[in-house]
């Protein structure tokens, strides 16, 4: 990974508590960032707290992002980044690699997480993170991307 320019690992697993990977990254000279993607309230709160740092990290590039399989939580994390941050900067939506219609899956879990993050961001800040119309439009774009055969 170092030879390919990776400087940052983003670990999306909420259910993994060992320090093994963070210590391995540290020994290898790679930064490690845990951004837990899970539906339980404690993890949603953590995601929202870390969201600005996560966005900055993605913007900086040269990262490797993964969960256990590298598909489903990755889709959720990158869609959350796009809906609540990157779309406003003119960045294209991420390709959907895990929750794809041609793989027999739907975007229901992505939508569930986006709805939950929207709700918690609104409650935390006292104002909607984006207008409801924009939010719905962006969710529709993600749904359409999941139907595409282009990855």
Go through the PLM ranges and name each one:
Residues 1-63, 83-94, 109:
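Cysteine-based protein phosphatase catalytic domain of the PTP/DSP
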Residues 12, 150-151:
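Short linear motifs in intrinsically disordered/low-complexity regions
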Residues 18-20, 73-76:
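Short catalytic/ligand-binding loop motif for oxyanion handling, primarily in non-cytosolic enzymes
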Residues 59, 75-150:
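Cysteine-dependent PTP/DSP-like catalytic domain, specifically the C-terminal lobe
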Residues 66:
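Short, surface-exposed ligand- or partner-binding patches at beta-edge/loop junctions that are enriched
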